UniProtKB/Swiss-Prot annotation:
The active site is at D303. Its cofactor is Zn(2+). The keyword Hydrolase applies. Gene3D superfamilies: Metal-dependent hydrolases, Urease, subunit C, domain 1. Disulfide bonds: none annotated. GO terms for biological process: 'de novo' UMP biosynthetic process; purine nucleobase catabolic process. It is an enzyme of class 3 (hydrolase). One of its GO terms (molecular function) is allantoinase activity. It comes from Macrococcus caseolyticus (strain JCSC5402) (Macrococcoides caseolyticum). InterPro entries: Amidohydro-rel (IPR006680), DHOase (IPR004722), DHOase/Allantoinase_Hydrolase (IPR050138), Dihydroorotase_CS (IPR002195), Metal-dep_hydrolase_composite (IPR011059), Metal_Hydrolase (IPR032466). This is Dihydroorotase. Pathway: Pyrimidine metabolism; UMP biosynthesis via de novo pathway; (S)-dihydroorotate from bicarbonate: step 3/3. Keywords: Hydrolase, Metal-binding, Pyrimidine biosynthesis, Zinc. It catalyses: (S)-dihydroorotate + H2O = N-carbamoyl-L-aspartate + H(+).
Length: 427
């Protein structure tokens, strides 16, 4: 039986246009106004916005090894609640997906428990120790989406160069958390006026930018697609912009929290605002927004990083880095940037859906049209609501945005035409 999404509105040339959508066998088979019902199951949308599903290439699902923070099941429920139909979990788990055995075990857990499409990363080095490279070819054959040691930077240039050479031969991407360990200095936040005022050790911006500068030259030499995770500083933006102008195959992402906040959000020793990379200066903050708009940064990824409440309820120097983002990304960005006229709705959808898929050559996140995969998110753009921890489907709610009032509530998420999330039905 087909499914008919009736009475929704889709984006056409930045205008919302009424269209019904018929789905059959996981694909869109018909679009138009007032389609015949035939024998379709009908879902009434009452004028709500219908978007292609979002693609998040940077999440932490914590399984295996960190199930008290998040599981594949809870993390993908949260993703679906946020409108994401494809997510890519990072390999900083225990064990690390650094072998065929480990990635196959992960694949089985995904098959059993995931509520949305999950494309797992494999690590670059064994156990993410930065020393011995994994078997790139074997891991690709067993479903690795790309290769990253996210959570730490690859410290040795020769290791990164060889990794890029192997990835390039397989037409795979190297995805990098960029951080020179010799420049961290035990920091817990950005090194700047706020860290000095609070007497909390800081991490300088150059810690990130130095490693990006090294890596773009290695990527050029290896002719490898090199993707930079969670860009946070104006220096990093400058390096990436120059590399793109030079024709180097570099792409980059930015998180919602780095687009929304800067270091001045931290007014006391509060680990809910501890993230890596840290919130930096207002100058950095504005550079990130400008870089996204001019294409230096390609898209938005959440870096959804759940932690248990007791882990975050510590001083910043002791608590883990990270905040959750799967369930809050769209409403926060829509409220801040689209509602006030800085961006169009189409731009936001490009950053969350279309461009992540394009950068990694995925068939997901593409525009809604006949023949496309029925990954669909339905959103009430006019509904205002408060972000509350008790409403989260994630096992964790470590975010500074609790209590914010936002617009853009996800009502329904479909993955290949099947309901992954429907408001009020969380079973």
């Amino acid at each position: 039986m087909s499914t008919l999404l009736r009475g929704g509105k889709v984006l056409v040339n930045d205008e919302l246009v009424s269209k019904d959508i018929r789905i059959e066998d996981g694909k869109i088979v018909e679009m138009g106004e007032k389609l015949n019902v035939y024998n379709s199951e009908i879902i009434e949308l009452d004028g709500k916005f219908v978007s292609q599903g979002f693609v998040d290439v940077h999440v932490h699902l914590r399984e295996p090894g960190g199930e008290h923070k998040e599981t594949i099941e809870s993390g993908t429920r949260a993703a679906a609640r946020g409108g994401f139909t494809t997510v890519c979990p990072m390999p900083n788990t225990r064990p690390v997906p650094d072998s065929v055995e480990h990635i196959e075990a992960l694949n089985q857990s995904i098959k059993q428990h995931a509520k949305v499409r999950v494309l797992p990363y494999a690590s670059i080095t064994e156990r993410q120790l930065g020393k011995d490279l994994v078997d790139f070819k074997a891991l690709k054959e067993h479903g690795a989406f790309a290769f990253t040691d996210d959570g730490v930077g690859v410290q040795t240039a020769s290791i990164m160069y060889e990794a890029m050479q192997q990835a390039a031969q397989l037409n795979m991407a190297i995805v990098a958390h960029c951080e020179d360990n010799s420049l961290i200095y035990g920091g817990a936040m950005h090194e700047g006026k706020v860290s000095k005022a609070l007497n909390i050790p800081g991490i300088p911006s150059i810690c990130e930018a130095v490693q990006i500068a090294r890596d773009v030259l290695l990527a050029e030499a290896a002719d490898c697609h090199y993707h930079v995770c969670h860009v946070s500083s104006k220096e990093s933006v400058r390096v990436i912009r120059d590399a793109k102008r030079a024709g180097i195959k570099v792409t980059a992402e930015v998180t919602p929290h780095h687009l929304l906040l800067n270091e001045t959000a931290i007014t006391e020793d509060d680990a809910i605002l501890k993230m890596n990379p840290p919130l930096r200066s207002e100058e950095d903050h504005q550079a990130l927004i400008e870089a996204l708009l001019d294409g230096t940064i390609d898209f938005i990824a959440t870096d959804h990083a759940p932690h248990a409440a007791d882990e975050k309820n510590q001083p910043m120097t002791k608590a883990p880095f990270g905040i959750v983002g799967s369930e809050t990304a769209f409403p926060l960005l829509y409220t801040r940037f689209v509602k006030n006229g800085d961006w169009t709705l189409g731009q936001l959808i490009d950053y969350l859906a279309l461009k992540p898929g394009q950068v990694f050559g995925l068939p997901y996140g593409k525009s809604l049209e006949v023949g496309s995969i029925a990954d669909i998110t339905v959103i009430d753009l006019d509904e205002k609501y408060e972000i509350k921890s008790e409403d989260f489907l994630s096992k964790s709610s470590n975010t500074p945005f609790i209590g914010e009032h936002v617009y853009g509530n996800v009502k329904l998420t479909l993955v290949e035409g099947q309901i992954a999330y429907q408001e009020g039905q969380h079973a």
